[in-house]
């Protein structure tokens, strides 16, 4: 299920990033009292009343002073966010009258046809603030807020959530594996999807996806069922067409949310880019199974060491994803493409692996005996017991005498031991450390 998207827009210096940080639960966007600090779109997940959603912070939109390249770029970024959004929060400064930029932005938002909530920010005295001037923007009743102090944010979120589309449950066989093919533009996503589908004799159907403008292709292979979520097949609209690279990140994130296994495509000729890192990081945090697929391998001049060098470079650039298997392919020629589905099956199984509690604790005792935790000011960490509490991704709780004694290096040691004993190849592992009450030890 794809999460709704909420875009925060407005002219510069009205408090968009402060509101974004308030909703994201921490300091994510840089907040300074000058225009133009947020130039690119920032994405974070949030939740209200049990509804999860993605929020986007954008740079300020200016129409009056739009002659600089940076101003034009920031405006384009905001236009992309509007295109992506299910709900738009238009932030205005309640301490001054509407400006010409406010009027122009309001016109743009009305034409979008999206639900728009007018958030009147910087309200310090709710009893005395007059907001009647802002009704002229034609966007309904303003919601007075103070993003800095967190005042009335709950009312704003109530209004936001009320506009979310209803959840639509997809009727899909639980044994069906959903595969998201993600990556930058021109990396070969469409070619890979077409090659995979073209090699299969039984293409069951095309299923309209819950993600806007996506077409999911369902097919069978050796009696197993798959759905490919094809981000490359999405339509691009109007002025957004020229901004395919920026827009592709959002499409990829939505596909990640709905998938079981991700095929992360990299261009053999370009290596790992910053955008690749962003998409890979989102996949890692989402707990999805992942395969790193290096495409266009047929175009690379190589010797017997080229593949090893390339894989080493990938591991250095994506250090947080050492667990992901790598496959070098050519979607154009079909080189090694037939191996992909076997690897997808394997990674999906690894991401769903369960470990019996008795087996786990026997091994945990051995690991601690072989490598006892270091002492900290005379105190030593005691790992009392562990249990697995979830899959997709495999999630483990370690009960200890004092969670503050669990150093990140020892946590990494335990994760490495889990992988050595049980595999989990292609799958992230979640580790939760909880402190056991002294009297219950």
Swiss-Prot record:
Record-listed GTP 1 binding positions: 10-17, 57-61, 121-124
Biological process, per Gene Ontology: ribosome biogenesis
Pfam families registered for this protein in UniProt: KH_dom-like, MMR_HSR1
List of residues binding GTP 2: 183-190, 230-234, 295-298
Keyword Ribonucleoprotein: no
Domain of life (superkingdom): Bacteria
HAMAP family for the chain: GTPase_Der
Entry similarity comment: Belongs to the TRAFAC class TrmE-Era-EngA-EngB-Septin-like GTPase superfamily. EngA (Der) GTPase family.
Protein's UniProt name: GTPase Der
């Amino acid at each position: 299920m794809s999460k709704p998207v909420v875009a925060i827009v407005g002219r510069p210096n009205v408090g968009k990033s402060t509101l974004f940080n308030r909703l994201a639960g921490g300091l994510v966007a840089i907040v300074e009292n000058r225009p133009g600090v947020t130039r690119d779109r920032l994405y974070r997940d949030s939740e209200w009343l049990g509804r999860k959603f993605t929020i986007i912070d954008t740079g300020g939109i200016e129409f009056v002073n739009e002659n600089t390249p940076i101003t034009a770029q920031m405006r384009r970024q905001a236009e992309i966010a509007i295109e992506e959004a299910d709900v738009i929060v238009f932030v205005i400064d309640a301490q001054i009258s509407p400006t010409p930029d406010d009027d122009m932005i309001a016109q743009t938002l009305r034409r979008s046809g999206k639900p728009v909530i007018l958030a009147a920010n910087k309200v310090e005295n709710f009893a005395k603030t007059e907001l009647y001037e802002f009704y002229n923007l034609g966007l309904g009743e303003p919601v007075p807020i103070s993003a800095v102090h967190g005042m009335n944010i709950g009312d704003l979120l109530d209004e936001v959530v009320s506009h979310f589309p209803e959840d639509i449950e997809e009727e899909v066989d639980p044994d069906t594996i959903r595969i998201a093919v993600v990556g930058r533009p021109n990396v070969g996503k469409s070619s890979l999807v077409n090659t995979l589908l073209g090699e299969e004799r039984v293409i069951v159907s095309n299923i309209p996806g819950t993600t806007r403008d996506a077409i999911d292709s369902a097919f069978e292979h050796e009696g197993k069922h798959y759905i490919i979520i094809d981000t490359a097949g999405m339509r691009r609209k109007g002025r957004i067409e020229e901004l395919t690279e920026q827009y592709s990140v959002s499409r990829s994130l939505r596909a990640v949310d709905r998938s079981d296994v991700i095929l992360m495509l990299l261009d053999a000729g370009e290596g790992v880019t910053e955008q690749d890192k962003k998409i890979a990081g989102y996949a890692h945090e989402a707990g999805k199974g992942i395969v790193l697929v290096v495409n266009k391998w047929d175009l690379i001049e190589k010797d017997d060491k080229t593949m090893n060098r390339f894989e080493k470079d990938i591991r250095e650039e994506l250090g947080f994803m050492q667990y992901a298997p790598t496959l070098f392919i050519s979607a154009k020629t079909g080189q090694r493409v037939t191996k992909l589905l076997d690897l997808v099956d394997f990674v999906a199984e690894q991401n769903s692996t369960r470990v019996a509690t008795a087996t786990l604790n026997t091994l945990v005792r051995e690991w601690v005996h072989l490598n006892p935790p270091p002492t900290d000011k005379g105190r030593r960490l005691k790992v009392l017991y562990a249990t697995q509490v979830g899959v997709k991704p495999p999630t483990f709780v370690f009960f200890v005498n004092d969670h503050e004694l669990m150093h990140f290096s020892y946590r990494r040691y335990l994760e490495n031991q889990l992988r050595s004993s049980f595999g989990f190849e292609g799958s992230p592992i979640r580790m939760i450390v909880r402190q056991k009450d002294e009297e219950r030890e």
